[in-house]
Amino acid sequence: MFIKSLQIANKDGVIRLIKFHAGLNLIVDETPVDEASTESTKTTGNNVGKTTVLMLVDFCLGADAKGIYTDPETKKGEYTLVKNFLIETEVLITLTLVEDLDDPLAKTIVIERNFLSRKKCIRRINGLQKTIEEFE
């Protein structure tokens, strides 16, 4: 299976849609360099979402949501701002997998997850809600 797309949306609409293609896919910093600035600024590639994209794919494949909003170095501190945003705006992550990226008729699996709990929890595969046990 290949990753076809990763969509991040909330109750206000699509936040980000990342489409993948055959071959090497890169996440790069496309921040424009401010040539008018007198300060020496450099495009670093920091904070463009490389690790977050990987964590969201992992989350869709069954990982714990805490990995998204917990400090990756200490594994203890929570980023409350991030956690609250994910819950309060009802963020939904949709991962689309396909057997063949070049075949529009290829078998497709759509996995959807959100960060809500209990009855509001979304844990779907091809539109069917799954229990935690079934999802794993």
Residue spans for each PLM region:
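Extreme N-terminal "head/tail" segments of very large remodeling/mechanoenzyme assemblies
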Residues: 1-109
